[in-house]
Swiss-Prot record:
Organism of this sequence: Shigella dysenteriae serotype 1 (strain Sd197)
Name of the molecule in the record: 2-keto-3-deoxy-L-rhamnonate aldolase
One Pfam match: HpcH_HpaI
Residues annotated as binding substrate: 151, 178-179
Catalytic reaction(s) noted: 2-dehydro-3-deoxy-L-rhamnonate = (S)-lactaldehyde + pyruvate
Length: 267
C-alpha cells in the first residue's frame, strides 16, 4: 500500500489560512459524525475534560474519517505512553494541555517522533495510523504529516511563551482562556479587560513567531475578536453546550419560567 500521508489541517495552517472548529465533548462516534457533516474545518475530540477512553477516541476518529472535517485529539495529558497510543490509533494532529515550559514542549515533541529524532515507540504493524503495516515507509513519512499544538493556559506558560515558541516541532499554540484567566487571578472571567489584553498580545506574539494561534470561544463576539487579532484556528462552540442550550430553548417555548440559552462565557 504505497500511500502518501497528508494532513490537510496542518497544510492549511502552514499557509496561514483561517480554520473554524467545534469542540466535541459528548464522547460518542454518532455525535462526532453528525458534527463532521456540518462543515466545520476541524473537530476537537476532547480527552482531557470529557470522559473519553482510548477506544472512544478511536471510534470517533473512525466516524469522522470519511468527511472533510479534520480531527484534532486532545489527550488528558502529554505523557509519552499516552501520546504513543493516540498516534497509533490514527491521530495526526494533537492538542496537548498544560505545557508550561520549553522543556515540556521539547519532551512532547520527542514523544511524537520516531528515533533517531525522538522517543516514540515502534509498533506500526498493530497501528491504525500505519494501516496495520500496509503503508510503505510510514516511519519515514509520518514526521512531516504530524501537527503538534500545545496549550498555554497559565501565568508560568505566558512567562515562557517566547521560549516555547522557539521549540522546533511545535506547529501552533492554543490559548486556554478558562485556565489562563484563573491563573491570572480572574477565575471564570475570561472576559476581564486585563485577560483580554493578555490574550490579544499572546495571539500576536504567536503569529509573529511564525506559529499558528488557536482559541476556543463559545461566544460569537469573542470568536470574531480573536480572529481579528490573528488567531487562525478557532473553535466557536462546544457540542454539549450547544445541545443543552438547544434543549432549554425548545422547552422554554412551551413551559413558562424556563431559562433560554446560557452561552455567555469562554468554556
Amino acid at each position: 500500500m504505497n500511500a502518501l500521508l497528508t494532513n490537510p489541517f496542518k497544510e492549511r495552517l502552514c499557509k496561514g489560512e483561517v480554520q473554524i472548529g467545534l469542540w466535541l465533548s459528548s464522547t460518542t462516534a454518532y455525535m462526532a459524525e453528525i458534527a463532521a457533516t456540518s462543515g466545520y474545518d476541524w473537530l476537537l475530540i476532547d480527552g482531557e475534560h470529557a470522559p473519553n477512553t482510548i477506544q472512544d477516541l478511536y471510534h470517533q476518529l473512525q466516524a469522522v474519517a470519511p468527511y472533510a472535517s479534520q480531527p484534532v485529539i486532545r489527550p488528558v495529558e502529554g505523557s509519552k505512553p499516552l501520546i504513543k497510543q493516540v498516534l497509533d490509533i490514527g491521530a495526526q494532529t494533537l492538542l496537548l494541555p498544560m505545557v508550561d515550559t520549553a522543556d515540556q514542549a521539547r519532551q512532547v515533541v520527542s514523544a511524537t517522533r520516531y528515533p533517531p529524532y525522538g522517543e516514540r515507540g515502534v509498533g506500526a504493524s498493530v497501528a491504525r495510523a500505519a494501516r496495520w503495516g500496509r503503508i510503505e515507509n510510514y516511519m519515514a513519512q509520518v514526521n512531516d504529516s504530524l501537527c503538534l499544538l500545545v496549550q498555554v493556559e497559565s501565568k508560568t506558560a505566558l512567562d515562557n511563551l517566547d521560549k516555547i515558541l522557539d521549540v522546533q516541532g511545535i506547529d501552533g499554540v492554543f490559548i486556554g482562556p478558562a485556565d489562563l484567566s484563573a491563573s491570572l487571578g480572574y477565575p471564570d472571567n475570561a472576559g476581564h479587560l486585563e485577560v483580554q489584553r493578555i490574550i490579544e498580545t499572546s495571539i500576536r506574539r504567536i503569529r509573529d513567531a511564525g506559529k499558528a494561534a488557536g482559541f476556543l470561544a463559545v461566544a460569537p463576539d469573542m470568536a470574531q475578536q480573536c480572529l481579528a487579532w490573528g488567531a487562525n484556528f478557532v473553535a466557536v462552540g462546544v457540542d454539549t453546550m450547544l445541545y443543552s442550550d438547544a434543549l432549554d430553548q425548545r422547552l422554554a417555548m412551551f413551559k413558562s419560567g424556563k431559562n433560554g440559552p446560557r452561552i455567555k462565557g469562554s468554556y
